[in-house]
Structure formats: C-alpha cells, structure tokens
C-alpha cells in the first residue's frame, strides 16, 4: 500500500491539473493536456454530462493508474460506473477510490462557479481519505479520517485547518441547501427543524466546504424520485468526519459505500456535529408524519 504522503503528493498534482482543465472549459479556452476544446454536452441519463466531466475523468483515471500501477485498490468513477457495476453486486475491492470528476455539472454549465471534484478512498465500505477540489476558489480540502485531520490547501501549498462553527442551538444553525432538488417534504422537514439562516450553494462538496469554513452548520439530503450516489457523498463525508463533524442517516446509521447499491437514499444529515443527535431525532419524528414508511 502506498504511504499517505505518496498518495497526497499525487493527489495534489492531479487535482490542480483537473482544476486547470475545468477552468479552461468554463472560460471557453483550450484545455491543457490535449483535451478537445469544444464543451459538448450530453443531456441524457440522470443529468448532463459534458466534455469537461469526461476529460477530468480520463485525467484522474490515467493519473492514478500511472502513479500507482501496483496499488491494491480499484477505481470507480461516476462516468464509468455504468460499465463497471452490476446491479446489486459490490465491486470486489477492499480498497476503492470513488471519483466524481465534476460534481455540480449544472452549476458548471450555468457559470455559477459552484462546482467541485470529489475523490475518496474507501476501505471496507467506509471512507478513510477525502478530497474536495473547488477550482473557482482555488482551494482543495483534504481529510484523513483516522488521523482526525482536515485542512484546506491552495496552489502554493498554504494550508489552514478546518474551522467548524461552535453554534449549537437549532435556531442559530445555518442551513446550506441546493437551489434545486427541493420538494414539499423537504420544505416541511426544514420548517419543523426551525433552523436559522439558509445559504444556497451548488455541489455537495461545495456545501460541505461551507461547513468546514464555519459559514454554515447543516446540510440535509432527502431522496425522492432520485437519490445522490456514492460519488456525491464519499469525499465530502470523509473530509467532514476528519474535521470532527458528523454525517449520517437520520436514524444514526452510517453511510455505506460499495454495498451493491450506489444510491445514497434516505434522509442524510451532515453537520458541525454539535446538534447532530437532536437533528436526527427531530427529522425521524417529522418524516414519520409527513412520509410514513420512508426509510431514513
């Protein structure tokens, strides 16, 4: 197994190269490394997939395989999952990298700048290392779960630790939410939780980064017609846990990855950890009323 230091060194190079690719596409410039300049978009499937997604996907996969040809892990990416996965069957891998080359494709295409790249190393269904790159902020978050260490890093190597807020009272907690993906059930749940202010941000990684900076405190995902996938959640969860925060189902159960179903369905609550138990308890009670039988 490569050392943590060796892995981080490769990750630093790959994420900043990925940032250069994405920023070039976002500005209609020629991407580096010979990727096609046209930002073509496929609107089929469960969401738009752009040439930028595919370029970063290829860059990350090639980079991992080149740097670690004999590493004891498998690689799973959002863009290759359909080819790799068989319904109901996990990959035969004790160690697994789960990659999302572009989380927040709609925000990327709309030019909000609120998109991210996710990389997570999962061991026996639980994340142990996470990376969330925010290209337009020129920031990358790293999280080492076992070491309980999370930090933000810039291109020049400057680091600062995660700084979760100290807010505890529900009425003081700041919610970070999507501009989209909101339905009546979620609105009723949020009304019952009676949180404080709300901040709208694109990308799960971008949302969790606001918790890591202490700007917000709570993120809630409530599945409906669709659900987030392993690649949406694994890296943000890893960094938040490494920072001392909390990320779980509303019944307190942990999120599991590579378990044969890439959907992360249910009510998922991420927070600064200060009021996680209270939030989970209230969410369970509320959902039992507004959506009986819903598996949290």
Regions found by a protein language model. Give the residues of each.
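Residue-level signal for inorganic ion chemistry
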Residues: 22, 53, 64, 105, ...
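N-terminal subdomain of lithium-sensitive/metallo-dependent phosphomonoesterases centered on the IMPase/IPPase/PAP
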Residues: 1-102, 188, 275, 288-296
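DPxDG-like acidic metal-binding loop motif
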Residues: 87-155
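Acidic active-site catalytic centers that drive phospho-/nucleotidyl reactions
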Residues: 53, 78, 100-103, 107, ...
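An extended, acidic
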Residues: 163-296
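Short secondary-structure junctions
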Residues: 30-41, 149-150, 194-201
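Short helix-loop capping/hinge motifs at secondary-structure junctions, enriched
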Residues: 149-152, 157-159, 274-280
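Conserved acidic residues
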Residues: 73, 94-96, 128, 173, ...
């Amino acid at each position: 197994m490569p050392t943590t230091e060796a892995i981080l060194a490769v990750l630093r190079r790959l994420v900043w190269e990925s940032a250069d690719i994405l920023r070039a596409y976002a500005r209609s410039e020629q991407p580096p490394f010979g990727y096609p300049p046209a930002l073509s978009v496929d609107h089929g499937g469960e969401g738009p997939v752009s040439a930028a997604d595919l370029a970063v996907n290829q860059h990350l996969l090639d980079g991992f395989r080149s740097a670690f040809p004999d590493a004891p892990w498998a690689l799973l990416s959002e863009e290759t999952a359909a080819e790799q996965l068989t319904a109901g069957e996990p990959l035969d891998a004790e160690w697994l990298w789960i990659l999302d080359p572009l989380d927040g494709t709609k925000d990327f295409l709309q030019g909000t700048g609120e998109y991210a790249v996710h990389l997570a190393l999962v061991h026996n269904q639980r994340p142990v290392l996470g990376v969330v790159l925010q290209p337009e902020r020129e920031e990358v978050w790293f999280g080492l779960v076992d070491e309980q260490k999370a930090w933000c890093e810039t291109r020049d190597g400057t680091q600062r630790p995660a700084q979760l807020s100290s807010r505890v009272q529900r009425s003081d907690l700041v919610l970070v939410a999507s501009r989209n993906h909101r339905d009546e059930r979620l609105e009723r749940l949020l009304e019952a939780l009676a949180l404080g202010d709300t901040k709208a941000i694109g990308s799960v990684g971008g949302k969790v980064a606001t918790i890591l900076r202490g700007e917000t405190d709570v993120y809630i995902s409530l599945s409906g017609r669709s659900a987030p996938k392993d690649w949406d959640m694994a890296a943000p969860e890893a960094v938040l846990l490494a920072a001392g925060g909390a990320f779980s189902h509303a019944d307190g159960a942990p999120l599991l990855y590579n378990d044969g179903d890439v959907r992360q369905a249910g009510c998922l609550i991420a927070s600064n950890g200060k009021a996680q138990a209270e939030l989970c308890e209230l969410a369970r009670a509320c959902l039992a009323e507004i959506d009986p039988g819903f598996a949290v």
